[in-house]
Amino acid sequence: MAGRSGVNDEELLRAIRVIKILYQSNPYPNDSGTRQARKNRRRRWRARQRQIRALSERILSSCVGGLQEPSTLPLPPLDRLSLNPEEDLGTSETEHPQGTATT
């Protein structure tokens, strides 16, 4: 697949097939039974979904090589930051007074 270097396409497709099988192995529970039984089934289903999601992330990260660290963003100087809302009023030309609509 274009844009990736060093990743075997067959290995990636195999990982995706495994993840698909994992998700298909845990269908949403049916609506029969008492309210409490349905609630318990949904709770167990959500727990299994969390486990499947964690496994899927581990499979993909081992195949692709993990997530890239985001580059650090330059932050403004802390002495210019303010929590006073009065200083923030009217700083943007796109702000409109409350209650007026723009078309």
Curated annotation (Swiss-Prot):
It is found in: Host nucleus, Host nucleolus; Host cytoplasm. Residues 18-26 are annotated as: Homomultimerization. Residues 25-48, 66-103 are annotated as: Disordered. Transmembrane segments: none annotated. Asymmetrically arginine dimethylated at one site by host PRMT6. Methylation impairs the RNA-binding activity and export of viral RNA from the nucleus to the cytoplasm. Phosphorylated by protein kinase CK2. Presence of, and maybe binding to the N-terminus of the regulatory beta subunit of CK2 is necessary for CK2-mediated Rev's phosphorylation. GO terms for biological process: mRNA transport; viral process. Coiled coil: none annotated. InterPro entries: REV_protein. One of its GO terms (cellular component) is host cell cytoplasm. A motif (Nuclear export signal and binding to XPO1) lies at residues 73-84. The modification Phosphoserine is found at residues 5, 92. Gene3D superfamilies: 6.10.140.630. Residues 25-34 have a biased composition (Polar residues). It holds the Pfam family REV. Residues 36-48 have a biased composition (Basic residues). One of its GO terms (molecular function) is RNA binding. Homomultimer; when bound to the RRE. Multimeric assembly is essential for activity and may involve XPO1. Binds to human KPNB1, XPO1, TNPO1, RANBP5 and IPO7. Interacts with the viral Integrase. Interacts with human KHDRBS1. Interacts with human NAP1; this interaction decreases Rev multimerization and stimulates its activity. Interacts with human DEAD-box helicases DDX3 and DDX24; these interactions may serve for viral RNA export to the cytoplasm and packaging, respectively. HIV-1 lineages are divided in three main groups, M (for Major), O (for Outlier), and N (for New, or Non-M, Non-O). The vast majority of strains found worldwide belong to the group M. Group O seems to be endemic to and largely confined to Cameroon and neighboring countries in West Central Africa, where these viruses represent a small minority of HIV-1 strains. The group N is represented by a limited number of isolates from Cameroonian persons. The group M is further subdivided in 9 clades or subtypes (A to D, F to H, J and K). Belongs to the HIV-1 REV protein family. The RNA-binding motif binds to the RRE, a 240 bp stem-and-loop structure present in incompletely spliced viral pre-mRNAs. This region also contains the NLS which mediates nuclear localization via KPNB1 binding and, when the N-terminal sequence is present, nucleolar targeting. These overlapping functions prevent Rev bound to RRE from undesirable return to the nucleus. When Rev binds the RRE, the NLS becomes masked while the NES remains accessible. The leucine-rich NES mediates binding to human XPO1. Escorts unspliced or incompletely spliced viral pre-mRNAs (late transcripts) out of the nucleus of infected cells. These pre-mRNAs carry a recognition sequence called Rev responsive element (RRE) located in the env gene, that is not present in fully spliced viral mRNAs (early transcripts). This function is essential since most viral proteins are translated from unspliced or partially spliced pre-mRNAs which cannot exit the nucleus by the pathway used by fully processed cellular mRNAs. Rev itself is translated from a fully spliced mRNA that readily exits the nucleus. HAMAP family: REV_HIV1. This is Protein Rev. It comes from Simian immunodeficiency virus (isolate EK505).
